[in-house]
């Protein structure tokens, strides 16, 4: 049965109704705030924007006072936010409706498993596949947590819109409640007054687990097993989705990540998942009133019941309730042990008096914490078996099944935490250790070969460590060793899986990896036979990606490395950086270099008998590797996905994908389906054509790289253009993350972090990282020989990688606006700097023409009508914000705004990012 499209014409009509209603309410609230006369300014601005009369729009905006700017910029920031909510609600509704009512509907996962069931290795693939979304704290989420909480309420209310229309609930009361929340959001500070701290980022991301991810991952895993069973495949304990996290462990460029934040990240995770179990056990306690006078439990349930401290006379004949009470008591002790704080919600959630917890039995039979999730699961399994023995299998479904599945997936923490640090920091620490131990006085001056010889020798000097209490350590070394010590303690306490990887940013050599091994050895996480934390190189720049094959070949040749990998099921993970490679060489060079690197690294792994797995460091925007997840995965090189893939999810993308459990389920389903399809299917129509396609790409990408670097690195005015004709300075002062905008003082483009680079190009609507250099490179190839355009058209139709590459450019171009970009260019002080815009404009027009020619389309987004419709509905609103932002930046730079007014610029940044939906 074919997969039905989620976007229907009826759905678009509902969205239009909702948007009209939301707009009406927002208008009424704003009128009341500023009066009818002032609101006419907003109305005139809207008319001019819809007519695209940008000259007149600029004049009107220039005459708005600073005081009026506050409400007007707020209005145009809130409106696209409300449109986003409406679209998200209707996507969730359609997913839920088709899953629950349409018997002909088969989601992508169902189709994928159905197709796989007939293959000889189908069961093995389904048992082994593991997709790991890794949530990061990259600063691209501009919304305050308070705003997100209010939007959640509006989301829930809009879910009831159809019921309100149908009279199932009171339409008038529904409208009143919706109006209340829109009024609250309109009168709430959009911008954070202070920069986020790491502890805030940890707390913020936990709301997605509490609100959607635990349920979505658990439900999806259960459905995964059921679908396989439906086709005759009994899976043991598959983990198609597990979660990862950087927050609290990613200290690359962030001095605020410490041993304390790493510990906090793990502790808060334990608290959240244990509270989830406690709540589920509370629900089971309330409902499992089975009487032993009617149903006799097995001996193990009777044993659990006998250990319960619930001494209520009313529970004497209810062994299941008392068994659940005992299990819950042990969870309480487990939470105290793992988090050093009691389960405060426990007794009240169960509905018992506090005396039940302090009965005399507690002194004679102290409740012990669970040693591991395995012990917890064993108690639940005992109850399950008793129910099966009595023919009560129906009672297993629901909360009991959910909590058992959750234990298998999560255990006592939610996500494996990655550690990450820059290679230069590790080199400095190792140099200090070697000097302090009188081994090498100036380690950094050694050649690469000499460095590796020294490091491997020290790694083989077991169990000797280099640090000594007698030798003073720098603050940097103390901090790094403290983090690794905490990592070891957390692994001992919560299990090996809690911290599995350490990523090395800017990996440029084999010694970078051995330097990390030295640091890990200092705290007992590495020895000759085993690495308890896998060393993961991150290749980021074009040059490093080109060198990755040789670096990994040399690394995998060492005997000690072979021992480490052998204890990790023969896997070696490699992280690929999409952001820096794009900033370094442009969109085409980045995409193609990453594609080739995966092929080469996979081959090197096969030569050494090692399974190479890839961790894709993608952002939200195309310029940082973003785009539709399904297409991104299925366009990877065939053979590059063995059975495991990891990918980053960050900033505004986390909210978009995981803010609602139905949408979260849908996105996770897409990730699994795409990964399985890429594992088993050679997507290209004719595999024999791939060599000729590669030759064509090599030629085009070489030209693209030259064109890109000529402007970005060779044009003496480009640096000033970026800093003067974009809001980069204002973006850098926005409180959207704990991490600084640059690793050091910015004096050149290479020193700027990728996120503010991409974020700023999104704000001025050029979207530069997602397309620059594409048009000229393709045009040169097309002009080289007759028939070359037809060859590119054939590649677009038959090669998923190439199709995805161009579709992303198509999407980025549709969000750009050169009329607005021209106005930003006028912010530059000199004509030479302003003239950079015309180079960009020429390339933009050429890129658009070439992309449409290769696609054989008349207009952008012909293949994506839903996005086209969505952009059409929201563009007039956030186009206005660009003109307001330009005017405010002029005033700010001319000292016509005071410090309190800077937040007006930040409001526009927020609104534009909201309208674009993926901005960093």
Curated annotation (Swiss-Prot):
Cellular component terms, GO, for this chain's entry? cytosol
Q: Which cofactor does it need?
A: Mg(2+)
Spell out the InterPro entries in the cross-references: PEP_COase, PEP_COase_bac/pln-type, PEP_COase_Lys_AS, PEPCASE_His_AS, Pyrv/PenolPyrv_kinase-like_dom
**Which GO molecular function entries does the Swiss-Prot or TrEMBL record give?**
magnesium ion binding; phosphoenolpyruvate carboxylase activity
Report the Pfam families cross-referenced here.
Answer: PEPcase
Enzyme kind, highest EC tier: lyase
EC number from the UniProt entry: 4.1.1.31
Instruction: Give the family from UniProt.
Output: Belongs to the PEPCase type 1 family.
PANTHER family given for it? PHOSPHOENOLPYRUVATE CARBOXYLASE (PTHR30523:SF6)
Function, as annotated? Forms oxaloacetate, a four-carbon dicarboxylic acid source for the tricarboxylic acid cycle.
What protein am I looking at? Phosphoenolpyruvate carboxylase
């Amino acid at each position: 049965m074919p997969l039905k499209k989620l976007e229907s014409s009826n759905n678009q009509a509902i969205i239009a109704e909702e948007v009209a209603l939301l707009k009406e309410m927002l208008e009424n609230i704003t009128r009341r705030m500023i009066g009818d006369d002032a609101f006419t300014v907003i109305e005139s601005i809207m008319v001019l924007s819809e007519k695209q009369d940008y000259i007149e729009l600029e004049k009107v905006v220039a005459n708005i006072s600073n005081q009026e700017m506050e409400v007007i910029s707020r209005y145009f920031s809130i409106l696209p936010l409300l449109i986003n909510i409406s679209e998200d609600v209707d996507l969730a509704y359609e997913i839920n409706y088709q899953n629950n009512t349409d018997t002909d509907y088969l989601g992508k996962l169902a189709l994928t498993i159905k197709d796989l069931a007939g293959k000889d290795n189908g069961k093995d693939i389904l048992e082994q596949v593991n997709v790991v979304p890794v949530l990061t704290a990259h600063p691209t989420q501009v919304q305050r947590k308070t705003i997100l909480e209010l939007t959640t309420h509006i989301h829930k209310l809009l879910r009831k819109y159809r019921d309100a229309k149908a009279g199932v609930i009171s339409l008038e009361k529904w409208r009143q409640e919706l109006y209340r929340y829109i009024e609250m959001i309109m009168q709430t500070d959009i911008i954070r007054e202070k920069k986020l701290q790491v502890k805030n980022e940890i707390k913020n991301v936990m709301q997605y687990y509490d609100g959607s991810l635990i349920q979505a991952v658990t439900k999806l895993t259960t459905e995964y097993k059921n679908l396989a069973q439906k086709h005759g495949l009994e899976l043991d304990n598959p983990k198609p989705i597990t979660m990862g996290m950087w927050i609290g462990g990613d200290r690359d460029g962030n001095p605020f990540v410490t041993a304390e934040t790493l510990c906090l990240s793990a502790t808060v995770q334990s608290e959240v998942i244990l509270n989830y179990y406690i709540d589920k056990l509370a629900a089971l306690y309330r409902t499992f009133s089975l009487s032993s006078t009617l149903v006799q439990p097995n001996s193990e349930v009777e044993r659990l019941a006998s250990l319960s401290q619930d001494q209520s006379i009313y529970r004497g004949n209810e062994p299941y309730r008392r068994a659940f009470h005992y299990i819950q008591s042990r969870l309480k002790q487990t939470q105290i042990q793992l988090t050093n704080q009691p389960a405060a919600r426990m007794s009240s959630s169960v509905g018992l008096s506090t005396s039940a917890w302090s009965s005399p039995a507690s002194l004679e039979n102290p409740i012990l914490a669970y040693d591991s999730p395995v012990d917890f699961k064993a108690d639940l399994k005992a109850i399950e078996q008793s129910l099966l023995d009595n023919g009560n299998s129906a009672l297993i479904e629901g909360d009991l099944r959910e909590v058992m599945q959750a234990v298998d997936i999560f255990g006592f923490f939610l996500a494996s935490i990655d550690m990450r640090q820059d290679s230069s920091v590790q080199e400095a620490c190792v140099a200090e250790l070697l000097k302090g131990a009188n081994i090498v006085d100036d380690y950094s001056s050694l050649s690469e070969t000499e460095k590796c010889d020294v490091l491997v020798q020290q790694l083989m000097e077991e169990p000797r460590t280099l640090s000594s209490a007698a030798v003073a350590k720098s603050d940097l070394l103390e901090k790094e060793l403290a983090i690794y010590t905490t990592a070891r303690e957390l692994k001992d306490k919560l299990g090996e899986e809690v911290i599995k990887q350490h990523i090395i940013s800017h990996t440029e050599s084999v010694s970078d990896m051995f330097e990390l091994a030295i640091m890990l050895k200092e705290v007992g996480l590495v020895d000759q036979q085993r690495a308890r934390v896998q060393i993961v190189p991150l290749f980021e720049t074009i040059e490093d990606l080109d060198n990755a094959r040789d670096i990994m070949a040399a690394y995998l040749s060492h005997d000690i490395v072979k021992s480490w990998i052998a204890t990790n099921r023969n896997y070696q993970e490699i992280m690929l950086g999409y952001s820096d490679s794009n900033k370094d060489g442009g969109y085409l060079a980045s995409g193609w270099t990453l594609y080739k690197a995966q092929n080469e690294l996979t081959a090197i792994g096969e030569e050494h008998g090692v399974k190479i797995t890839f961790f894709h460091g993608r952002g939200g925007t195309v310029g940082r590797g973003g785009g539709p997840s399904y297409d991104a995965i299925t366009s990877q090189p065939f053979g590059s996905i063995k059975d495991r893939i990891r990918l980053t999810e960050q900033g505004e993308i986390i909210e978009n994908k995981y803010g609602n459990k139905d949408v979260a389920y849908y996105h996770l389903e897409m990730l699994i389906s795409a990964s399985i399809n890429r594992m088993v299917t050679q997507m290209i129509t004719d595999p024999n054509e791939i060599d000729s396609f590669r030759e064509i790409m090599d030629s085009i990408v070489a030209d693209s790289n030259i064109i890109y670097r000529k402007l970005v690195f060779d044009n003496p005015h480009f640096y000033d253009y970026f800093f003067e004709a974009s809001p980069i300075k204002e973006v850098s002062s926005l409180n959207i993350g704990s991490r600084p905008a640059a690793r050091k003082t910015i004096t050149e483009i290479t020193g700027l972090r990728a996120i503010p680079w991409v974020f700023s190009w999104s704000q001025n609507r050029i979207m530069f990282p997602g397309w620059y250099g594409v048009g000229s490179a393709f045009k040169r190839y097309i002009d080289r020989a007759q028939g070359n355009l037809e060859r590119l058209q054939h590649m677009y139709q038959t090669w998923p990688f190439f199709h995805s590459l161009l579709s992303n450019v198509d999407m980025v171009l549709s969000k750009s606006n050169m009329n607005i970009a021209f106005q930003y260019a006028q912010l530059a002080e000199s004509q030479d700097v302003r003239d950079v815009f015309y180079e960009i404009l020429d390339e933009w027009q050429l890129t658009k023409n070439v992309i449409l020619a290769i696609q054989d389309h008349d207009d952008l987004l012909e293949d994506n009508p839903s996005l086209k419709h969505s952009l059409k509905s929201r563009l007039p609103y956030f186009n206005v914000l660009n003109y307001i932002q330009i005017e405010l930046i002029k005033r700010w730079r001319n000292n016509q705004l005071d410090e309190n007014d800077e937040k007006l610029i930040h409001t526009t940044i927020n609104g534009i990012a909201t309208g674009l939906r993926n901005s960093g």
